[in-house]
Regions:
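A structural signal for short, hydrophobic/glycine-enriched beta-strand patches
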Residues: 4-164
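A transmembrane-helix-recognition feature enriched in membrane-embedded lipid enzymes
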Residues: 165-192
Length: 195
């Protein structure tokens, strides 16, 4: 396919993997615990950080709490399955649950200050790393806290075949639009309703 190298290069623009060992925490962003948390466990085992911190998303359906559907319960189950005894903490939300990467950045900044962290690695899906890192760097500017990013891959698509799946197309087309919005904002857009 003549277009495959171009589409792969486009996808690679969105991926950042600049995490270094010695971080205070691996911060797993919400919205993809099934891929992001196992990646954080790998990084924990490789000595990147001594703890894993989960962000606190706003639940779409509060009734699911009793079923163990929140991300902390899922992370606990994944940790048990892996056999890795990584400490898991939850970063409390400043406003009743994060609805965006900007919300998570503000929440994590407050958490880092309270715990005197100097270096964190955010763990998210590979296609989300550039925008997530950009949002965190904007919010963390002047804090003297170093922020890095590492991406998690999934079993459905990669940067080399994303255009062959609905989920890959959705991820990479939407990510471009989201990146453009994040360039101009430092918080959730007032015209976008996040629930």
């Amino acid at each position: 396919m003549f277009h495959a190298p171009l589409l792969s290069a486009y996808a690679r623009f969105f991926s950042v993997a600049n995490g270094t060992q010695g971080a205070d925490a691996l911060v797993v962003l919400s919205g993809g615990i099934e891929t992001r948390f196992p990646r954080a466990l790998e990084l924990y085992q490789q000595g990147f950080a001594p703890r894993i911190v989960l962000t606190d998303p706003r639940l779409r359906n509060e009734r699911l709490l009793n079923l163990g559907c929140e991300e902390k319960a899922q992370a606990d189950a994944l940790r048990r399955l892996s056999g890795v005894q990584a400490p898991i903490e939850v970063c409390p939300s400043l406003k009743g649950g994060a609805t965006s990467t900007f919300d998570e950045a503000y929440d994590v900044l407050a958490y880092c200050k309270a715990h005197r962290f100097r270096h964190i690695i955010i763990v998210t899906d590979h296609y989300h790393t550039r925008r997530a890192l950009y949002a965190f760097e904007k919010i963390f500017r002047g804090s003297q806290i170093r922020v890095e990013a590492m991406g998690a891959h999934n079993d459905i698509f990669t940067p080399d075949n994303w255009w062959r799946t609905d989920r890959g197309i959705e991820a990479y087309v939407l990510e471009l639009m989201k990146c453009m919005v994040y360039v101009f904002l430092k918080k959730n857009a007032p015209f976008i309703q996040n629930y």
